[in-house]
Amino acid sequence: MMAEAIANSIGRGQLEAFSAGVRPASKIDPLAVELLNHAGLSPPEHPPQHVREFSAPDSPPLDFVFTLSDTAAGEAPPMWPGHPITAHWRCTDPEQFDDDVDRRQALIRTRKELERRLRLFTNLPVRSLDRMSLQSHLEQLGRGQDA
């Protein structure tokens, strides 16, 4: 949900991001909404959907799919329409923290890291890179390295 808000803000109409999960929450986390608003970002209006919503035959083709949780990365990937380039950009799961202070700090770190990665991603010369090079750059970003 945070990545969707950040990508749609940074992309300024050139990106259309969606949130999905293998076990999506039924509602948007109020703390995440608060932190996005504080950062000047518009949170999505709807909670994340299940990944199968984006792998149905009538789903729009996707160019890129980023997994953010180890759970999602460990699942067998669906057949995405459009044969997107995929990369795992591991993020701390704020749900692993019971304490609100720790959860808040994890969400802040996650927002900052996603923003850094997505800014680097949007500055890649996507049109001039072949698929393997682009895949390599996205994997580097997932490891926390500048592409």
Role assignments for model-derived ranges:
Residues 52-57, 75-77:
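Short, flexible, glycine/charge-rich loop motifs used to bind or transfer phosphoryl groups or to couple energy/partner
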Residues 1-55:
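Conserved active-site segments centered on acidic
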